[in-house]
């Protein structure tokens, strides 16, 4: 067993053995037609919150809207959004960098505007 100081640095098996989606796959999910489908999923009782509260950037399901809003304020979410603002490389750029193929004009990467997610009102339950 590692001591207390070493235990903090070990990666849990869940994180190590079940990696999430790659950034290019998340970029595909951010396209408007696919994002709309992910945000309006059918009810799935196996997922947290029945699959209704999903963060596309972090590919996580949440129990309720309040938890998802709290997640959006965290450093983890903000860093993921910052990482996703970079445009992914295309196959043509990769071939040109590797020396095979020709890419006429390599420009600086520009920022991608992420689609704004619709505000879903939180229903207020009257206390009796």
From Swiss-Prot:
Places the protein is found: Nucleus; Cytoplasm
Record keywords, A-Z: Cytoplasm, Metal-binding, Nucleus, Ribosome biogenesis, Zinc, Zinc-finger
Disordered as annotated region, ranges: 1-29
Zinc finger residue ranges, C2H2-type: 53-77
GO molecular function, one term: zinc ion binding
Main localization (coarse): nucleus
Protein name, as recorded: Zinc finger protein 593 homolog
Organism for this UniProt entry: Caenorhabditis elegans
